[in-house]
Amino acid sequence: MAQCGGGDVSRHRKGHLDTVESLCQGLLDDVMLDDDKCRAMFGYLQEWQDLASMCYGSLGGEPPLAPEASNGSGSSGGGGSFRKRRPDDAKGESNSICKRQRGKQQQQQQPCHPDQMAAAVGKGRPERARPGAKKKAEVASPKDSPATSASTVTAGQKTDYIHVRARRGQATDSHSLAERVRRERISERMRYLQELVPGCNKVTGKAGMLDEIINYVQSLQKQVEFLSMKIAASNPVVNFNIVEDLFGRQLSQAACNPAALPAMALPMAQVEPSCLQMSPLQQMQTSAGSSGYGLEMVVSNQYSPPGGPMSVPAGASVEPCLNVNGAAGWDIGSHGLFSGFDAPFQSVQSDCLLDNLKMEM
């Protein structure tokens, strides 16, 4: 009886499973699913008994009981009992199903054009701005700018000046022609200087040329100074303007101090007393201070008529007046008159000559 009862239960379960499978098969046929999906669904229903009970409850049948596991021996039921599936097997089947679906989707998407694929990817994922791309774009833009600027210049008005690509610190468009002319003038003058200065042609470079020219000019200046000093020492020339200035100073000092006057005048040993006589009237004038400097002198009180011979006193001799140390009395300017300050005159004269030569150069 027990075996008959067990056979009835197993038959009842098998009938319910057959009905569920038939219903699910109809649904799957309507949805057009694969056999693998159906098997996976039945595997999940057997794994989770709650879902199986819900499905069986909705169909109006009793849920099947879980089969008892046997140690290596099959069940003694009249029919075949279902084997319990492990969750690992179910997961493996689901993974294989997902892989097959992805393979089919890729095969369906392969006929698409590559441009459409790129557009779809661009819409789906926004590209990130790379830091190197911006720098490359900035570097590429200046390279393209000269070509574009040149094309615009040629397309527009033709300029009269010559366009020169200027570097930093140089002239550009409108000033390029003037800059070129200025440089040509400088180079031409440097060539002239090279021809004038001996040994400058061997030097290369503007800096070396300028050094050679400066050294040559300095040597010329030293030679001119030496020659001018030599000429001044060999040929002294009195500058009368300087002499007048010195006389004016000496006379002004003599007016303030009459004792300093004989130092400027002729030496007393060279002057004959008989030639230079001062009248009593002049002595009174000098004592009274009415005369300017007391230099009024008379040769003799005797007056001779015009055209007649000049009378000379008996005791006086004319030779001492006309001859001073064997030289003419009129040559007194270079020998006796300036004997007190010959050295200052020579130094002043040499300085004046040097100044005049430098001004002429």
From Swiss-Prot:
Practical and industrial applications: Plants expressing BCL2 in the lamina joint and the spikelet under the control of BUL1 promoter exhibit increased leaf angle and grain length.
Location of the region described as Disordered in the Swiss-Prot/TrEMBL record: 66-160
Disulfide cross-links: none
Tissue-specific expression: Expressed in panicles, leaves, leaves sheaths, lamina joints, stems and roots.
Coiled-coil boundaries: none
Residues in bHLH domain copies: 170-220
Residue numbers covered by motif Nuclear localization signal: 166-173
Keyword Transcription regulation: yes
Pfam families hit by this protein: HLH (PF00010)
Main location class: nucleus
Domain of life the protein comes from: Eukaryota
GO cellular component: nucleus
Record localization: Nucleus
Gene Ontology BP terms: gibberellic acid mediated signaling pathway; positive regulation of gibberellin biosynthetic process; regulation of DNA-templated transcription; regulation of unidimensional cell growth
Transmembrane residue ranges: none
Amino acid composition bias (Basic and acidic residues), ranges on this chain: 124-138
Renumbered residue ranges of the record's region Basic motif: 170-183
Keywords: Gibberellin signaling pathway, Nucleus, Transcription, Transcription regulation
GO-annotated molecular function: DNA-binding transcription factor activity; protein dimerization activity
Family: Belongs to the bHLH protein family.
Function: Together with BCL1, positive regulator of cell elongation at least partially through increased gibberellic acid (GA) biosynthesis.
Description of how the protein assembles with itself and partners: Homodimer. Interacts with IBH1.
Protein name per UniProt: Basic helix-loop-helix protein 79
Lineage: Eukaryota, Viridiplantae, Streptophyta, Embryophyta, Tracheophyta
